[in-house]
């Protein structure tokens, strides 16, 4: 069995976090700076 190459070079694994963190800023004025974790959000 042969392993496939990573989807993104130099990233050993990917984490998907399905949490509406944008709502924290809009509703509660709490800004969660997730840049340290390289978390990308969408516009929804």
Curated annotation (Swiss-Prot):
Key words, A-Z: Disulfide bond, Glycoprotein, Glycosidase, Hydrolase, Secreted
Highest taxon, organism lineage: Eukaryota
Record note on modification: Contains disulfide bonds. Glycosylated.
Intracellular or extracellular location(s): Secreted
Tissue-specific expression: Expressed by the venom gland.
Cleaved signal peptide residues: none
Catalysed reaction, written as an equation: Random hydrolysis of (1->4)-linkages between N-acetyl-beta-D-glucosamine and D-glucuronate residues in hyaluronate
Activity profile over pH: Optimum pH is 5.5.
Example GO biological process: hyaluronan catabolic process
UniProt EC number: 3.2.1.35
Xref: InterPro entries: Aldolase_TIM, Glycoside_hydrolase_SF, Hyaluronidase
A molecular function (GO) term: hyalurononglucosaminidase activity
Protein family: Belongs to the glycosyl hydrolase 56 family.
PANTHER family named in the record: HYALURONIDASE
General function of this protein: Snake venom endo-hyaluronidase that degrades hyaluronan to smaller oligosaccharide fragments. In venom, it is not toxic by itself, but increases the diffusion of other venom proteins such as crotoxin (a neurotoxic and myotoxic PLA2) by degrading the extracellular matrix. In addition, it displays antiedematogenic activity, since it significantly diminishes the oedematogenic activity of crotoxin (probably by direct substrate hydrolysis, since hyaluronan possesses strong water-binding capacity).
Name of the protein: Hyaluronidase CdtHya1
